[in-house]
């Protein structure tokens, strides 16, 4: 009995919930024995036992508290990183706002400077160097008149062109499509009542700066006022005693200036259908007239060889000399400077404070004729892009020439030539400066000294491609 009890193995109690498993202890003992055995014999088994299982057993185990602490620190770091990122974004936004404010202030300052220079008549934007000569295939030709084009105007929104000719008609064209929008036909002579059209050569036109009124003048001494949108005739101004050769609206108003071969300058109010006053001073037929915002106008005196500035309120005039021939065309560049052309082939730049030209370009379009008898090509039209240094001139030498005015308008340099056959009787820049319109005829607008048979009576739209306008420079 005692022997049986001594040989029987005592049952081991089951491990408690917190006790380490016994198998683990045995495994470690077995592993240790195996290590000892293999360390003596070497071999493949030694490599397997010294791998992951051993490293895992030797690596310190992280408690749950340590893991939670690590996770908690990571969240804090994330919050800190997001906070720094948010602050950086705020800083960048404030910098951008500051840059935008500075840019707006610069823009406002630049605009104010432009306004001051414009009011003083000294604004000169530099655009001429950026103009690229168009290819002949880019020029659009609009045909509809039977005789030579004499004058044209562009609406203030640059969407339509009015052209007039020796055939006594006026045509309104679409700039975009080139189609006729309206035709004002020739009026029959002797028709009873007020004719809704011209019965003689239309020599000049003008459109108000709001695009409401169109004025046209002819050889029969009449000025007709039209509603520009519908081309409906409104009324007729009479009073000139010879052909009406120049018309211009004062910018921002409905005050109309007219000039005539009767040597006078008249002032009208188109909105009120009224005559205001007449000014005298020229000694020969006046050929052309122009005006801007000031209550004054400039005239080209033809054979009397003078350019005159008329101060309407003071009823006074300034007289300028410089050309040697008949001054046939004139155009204001800004309130203080103008350009004129004459039949002696010269183009002149003027400042209102100087009685002589600031710059004079002789033989601006070259010479023609037999050797020893050469004569300069007449300058039949001039145009200027408002408040810039870009000028265009026309003649009958088969080209329109673009010019750059130097600083202070003291120099005139040629830029490029645009091929157009015929008399260039009228030139106008669009207000945006993206195209130039030329009125071409077989004859000069004021006579029939030559006839160019190969020319086509037409309106030509010349695209002007250029880089963005450079910063403003005032003289």
UniProtKB/Swiss-Prot annotation:
- Is Metal-binding included in the keywords of this UniProt record? no
Q: Name one GO biological process term.
A: ribosomal small subunit biogenesis
Q: Which residues carry this modification: N6-acetyllysine?
A: 12, 25
List compositional bias (Acidic residues) regions by residue number.
65-74
**Gene3D superfamilies assigned to the protein according to its UniProt record, in alphabetical order:** YVTN repeat-like/Quinoprotein amine dehydrogenase (2.130.10.10)
* Cited PROSITE patterns: WD_REPEATS_1, WD_REPEATS_2, WD_REPEATS_REGION
Q: Which GO terms describe its cellular component?
A: box C/D methylation guide snoRNP complex; nucleolus; small-subunit processome
Claim: rRNA-binding is one of the keywords in the record: no
Q: What does this protein do?
A: Component of a nucleolar small nuclear ribonucleoprotein particle (snoRNP) thought to participate in the processing and modification of pre-ribosomal RNA (pre-rRNA). Part of the small subunit (SSU) processome, first precursor of the small eukaryotic ribosomal subunit. During the assembly of the SSU processome in the nucleolus, many ribosome biogenesis factors, an RNA chaperone and ribosomal proteins associate with the nascent pre-rRNA and work in concert to generate RNA folding, modifications, rearrangements and cleavage as well as targeted degradation of pre-ribosomal RNA by the RNA exosome.
**Subunit:** Interacts specifically with the U3 small nucleolar RNA (U3 snoRNA). Binds a sub-fragment of the U3 snoRNA surrounding the B/C motif (3UBC). This association with the U3BC RNA is dependent on the binding of a protein called 15.5K to the box B/C motif. The association of the protein with the U3BC RNA was found to be also dependent on a conserved RNA structure that flanks the box B/C motif. Part of the small subunit (SSU) processome, composed of more than 70 proteins and the RNA chaperone small nucleolar RNA (snoRNA) U3.
Q: What is this protein called?
A: U3 small nucleolar RNA-interacting protein 2
UniProt organism field: Mus musculus (Mouse)
Query: What lineage, starting at the top, does this entry show?
Result: Eukaryota, Metazoa, Chordata, Craniata, Vertebrata
């Amino acid at each position: 009995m005692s022997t049986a009890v001594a040989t029987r193995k005592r049952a081991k109690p089951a491990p408690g919930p917190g006790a380490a498993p016994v198998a683990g202890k045995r495994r470690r003992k077995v592993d240790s024995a195996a290590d000892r055995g293999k360390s003596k014999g070497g071999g493949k088994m030694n490599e397997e036992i010294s791998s992951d299982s051993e490293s895992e057993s030797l690596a310190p185990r992280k408690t749950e508290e340590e893991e939670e602490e690590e996770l908690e620190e990571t969240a804090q770091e994330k919050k800190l990183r997001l906070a720094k990122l948010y602050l950086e974004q705020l800083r960048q936004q404030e910098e951008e706002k500051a840059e935008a404010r500075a840019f707006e202030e610069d823009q406002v300052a630049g605009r104010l400077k432009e306004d001051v220079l414009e009011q003083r008549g000294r604004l000169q934007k530099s655009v001429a160097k950026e103009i690229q000569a168009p290819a002949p295939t880019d020029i659009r030709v609009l045909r509809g008149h039977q005789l030579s084009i004499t004058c044209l105007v562009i609406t203030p929104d640059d969407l339509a062109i009015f052209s007039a000719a020796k055939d006594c008609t006026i045509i309104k064209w679409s700039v975009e499509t080139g189609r006729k929008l309206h035709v004002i036909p020739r009026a029959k002579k002797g028709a009873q009542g007020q004719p809704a059209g011209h019965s003689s050569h239309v020599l000049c036109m003008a459109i108000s700066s709001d695009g409401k009124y169109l004025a046209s003048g002819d050889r029969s001494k009449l000025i007709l006022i039209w509603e520009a949108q519908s081309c409906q005739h409104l009324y007729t101004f009479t009073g000139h005693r010879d052909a009406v050769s120049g018309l211009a609206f004062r910018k921002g108003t409905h005050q109309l200036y007219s000039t005539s071969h009767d040597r006078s300058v008249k002032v009208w109010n188109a909105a009120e259908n009224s005559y205001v006053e007449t000014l005298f001073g020229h000694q020969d037929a006046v050929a052309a007239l122009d005006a801007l915002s000031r209550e004054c106008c400039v005239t080209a005196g033809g054979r009397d060889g003078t350019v005159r500035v008329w101060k309407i309120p003071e009823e006074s005039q300034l007289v300028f000399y410089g050309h040697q021939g008949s001054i046939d065309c004139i155009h204001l560049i800004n309130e203080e400077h103008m350009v004129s052309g004459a039949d002696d082939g010269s183009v002149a730049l003027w400042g209102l404070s100087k009685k002589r030209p600031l710059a004079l370009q002789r033989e601006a379009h070259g010479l023609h004729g037999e050797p020893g008898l050469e004569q300069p090509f007449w300058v039949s039209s001039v145009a200027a892009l408002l408040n810039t240094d870009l000028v265009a001139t026309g003649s009958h030498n088969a080209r329109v020439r673009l010019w750059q005015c130097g600083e202070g308008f003291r120099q005139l340099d040629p830029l490029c030539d645009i091929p157009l056959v015929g008399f260039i009787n009228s030139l106008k820049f669009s207000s945006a400066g993206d195209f130039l319109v030329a009125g071409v005829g077989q004859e000069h607008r004021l006579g029939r000294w030559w006839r160019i048979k190969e020319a086509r009576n037409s309106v030509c739209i010349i695209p002007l491609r250029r880089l963005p306008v450079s910063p403003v420079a005032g003289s």
